[in-house]
């Protein structure tokens, strides 16, 4: 079922931060990435098996395919700013009336959600977030859809203006205002077991923090990575059928392989996340680094 989101004015073109609630924002940094390519490949779940996955839309590393390794990724270029981020990011391809819809851009936020100091992701770390086989709404703490950052016009005795409005969260692709962007958000776990770069199910080596603390089995706090894919509303609003390559609209998920220039990532984590406060939310008007 499509969900209609109403706004009194046009939406901002910029990608909105992950949904905000009351409270002060802490520090974070981000990569802004352009769409790179599509392929029925998944180097985490189906390595060395080209064409055997459902279709994915890749951003970041320009070379990501079924055979990708840390070494191959580090030799390739990136669609991200900063250029030091040569990591691989991907999510299922969105289809409107059977036609693939490429994201216009993606934002990858790196936040601190724990009270403990944050360590950089180890080189080559692999993660999966969200459920590709979901048949009902997933927790919005992990994945959700919205219409990005909206502006509402107001008028008063001293003139008018506009204020940002936090968008409504939906479990399915929403119908957005014409200039808005439908956005898929996926939040990755932020606690690591400190030993493995991957695990048999690509999840067991990672965990989500609870109340700002990492569980005993995953004691190492790492950046809380939030991936946001933005799609043009005009490409999906008139469609009769909308789905993801992994199945229905509930199947939002994403994958990540850390291939950052490691010294650059370490500098950002230490200089930004570990010098700031815990940031459970983001300022919805801020779409750039906030350190």
Predicted features by range, described:
Residues 25-53, 57-186, 193-291:
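Primary mode marks residue(s) on the alpha4-beta5-alpha5 output face of response regulator receiver
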Residues 1-24:
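Secretory targeting and sorting signals
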């Amino acid at each position: 079922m499509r969900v209609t989101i109403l706004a009194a004015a046009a939406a901002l073109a910029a990608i909105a931060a992950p949904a905000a609630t009351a409270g002060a924002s802490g520090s974070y940094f981000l990569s802004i990435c352009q769409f790179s390519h599509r392929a029925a490949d998944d180097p985490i779940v189906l390595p060395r098996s080209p064409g055997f996955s459902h279709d994915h839309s890749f951003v970041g590393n320009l070379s990501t395919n079924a055979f990708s390794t840390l070494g191959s990724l580090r030799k390739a270029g990136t669609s991200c700013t900063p250029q030091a981020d040569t990591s691989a990011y991907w999510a299922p391809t969105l289809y409107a009336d059977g036609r693939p819809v490429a994201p216009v851009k993606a934002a990858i936020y790196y936040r601190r959600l724990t009270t403990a100091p944050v360590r950089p992701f180890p080189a080559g770390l692999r993660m999966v977030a969200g459920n590709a086989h979901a048949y009902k709404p997933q927790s919005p703490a992990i994945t959700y859809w919205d219409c990005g950052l909206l502006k509402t016009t107001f008028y008063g005795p001293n003139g008018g203006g506009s204020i940002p409005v936090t968008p409504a969260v939906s479990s399915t692709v929403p119908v957005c205002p014409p200039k808005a962007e439908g956005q898929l958000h996926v939040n990755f776990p932020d606690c690591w077991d400190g030993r493995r770069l991957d695990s048999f199910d690509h999840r067991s080596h990672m965990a989500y923090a609870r109340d700002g603390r990492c569980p005993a089995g995953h004691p190492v706090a790492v950046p809380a990575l939030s991936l946001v894919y933005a799609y043009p509303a005009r490409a999906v609003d008139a469609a009769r059928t909308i789905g993801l390559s992994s199945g229905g609209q509930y199947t939002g998920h994403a994958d990540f392989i850390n291939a950052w220039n490691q010294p650059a990532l370490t500098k950002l984590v230490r200089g930004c996340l570990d010098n700031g406060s815990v940031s459970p939310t983001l300022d919805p008007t801020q779409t750039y680094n906030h350190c």
